[in-house]
Amino acid sequence: MDPNCSCPTSGSCSCAGSCTCKACRCPSCKKSCCSCCPVGCAKCAQGCVCKGASDKCSCCA
């Protein structure tokens, strides 16, 4: 189990939009959780499960 995620690091799980984990990489969706997903950020939209919008977006710089 990922200590920052409610789902196991292996096996299937659901990565919902309300994900609160920091480093969840679920094999079933192959996406990581991201706290920065401003409007128009295509990179985050494709590779992250958004935890919440933020103006300070480091993963999309």
UniProtKB/Swiss-Prot annotation:
Annotated residues for binding of a divalent metal cation 4: C33, C34, C44, C48
UniProt remark on domains: Class I metallothioneins contain 2 metal-binding domains: four divalent ions are chelated within cluster A of the alpha domain and are coordinated via cysteinyl thiolate bridges to 11 cysteine ligands. Cluster B, the corresponding region within the beta domain, can ligate three divalent ions to 9 cysteines.
Annotated protein name in UniProt: Metallothionein-1B
Tagged with keyword Metal-binding: yes
UniProt keyword Cell membrane, yes or no: no
SUPFAM superfamilies associated with the record: Metallothionein
Pfam families for the chain: Metallothio
Residues given in the record as a divalent metal cation 6 binding sites: C37, C41, C44, C60
InterPro entries (alphabetical): Metalthion_dom_sf, Metalthion_dom_sf_vert, Metalthion_vert, Metalthion_vert_metal_BS
Binding site residues for a divalent metal cation 3: C15, C19, C24, C29
